[in-house]
Amino acid sequence: MASTDKPGGDPEYRTSSTPAPAGVDYFKFDVILRFLLFAASLVAVVVIVTANQTEVIRVPQPVPWPAKFRYSPAFVYFVAALSVTGLYSIITTLASLLASNKPALKTKLLLYFILWDALILGIIASATGTAGGVAYLGLKGNRHVVGWNKICHVYDKFCRHVGASIAVALFGSVVTVLLIWLSAYSIHSRVPK
């Protein structure tokens, strides 16, 4: 069967001698956002770890009763998750700095960043949610369950530290979402149109 194609071939399937577009280079913003993620993780961990407070509670007789982050598994998970996030942000900041000088490595690295950033976002969000749930119980209590009374009127310094740490971790979650969007947009801008 004879081909009915024109000598030039189908323009849609023709190979181009021009290279693919370089795309928009946002690696400087990527480094800044990754540094912000590190700072947010570090601040959140330091603030919650220093949230120790001891108050005298009057049960039949006065007893000193401490409140520490390590007494709640949710807060321990929060500290562990944000510590992992801080380490991850250091590693990826260094990788971004090294890749900024090597254009061939940038696109592949962006794809890996999207995948790992999404995983880290899940870790940060789950840790912030669990710590936020426990903090809310400390603030408001649960009148439907015996023994789940509010404690923030007694342990005010501890609750302020926990609340501030959760707020900073929430900022870290937003920074991670921005990192994912930035990487996705950078990859999208590199796709030939």
From Swiss-Prot:
Membrane topology (Extracellular): 52-73, 130-161
Subcellular location per the Swiss-Prot or TrEMBL entry: Cell membrane
Pfam family of the protein (one): CASP_dom
Domain of life: Eukaryota
Keywords (A to Z) from UniProt: Cell membrane, Glycoprotein, Membrane, Transmembrane, Transmembrane helix
Family according to the record: Belongs to the Casparian strip membrane proteins (CASP) family.
Protein name as it appears in the record: CASP-like protein 1D2
Organism in which the protein naturally occurs: Glycine max (Soybean)
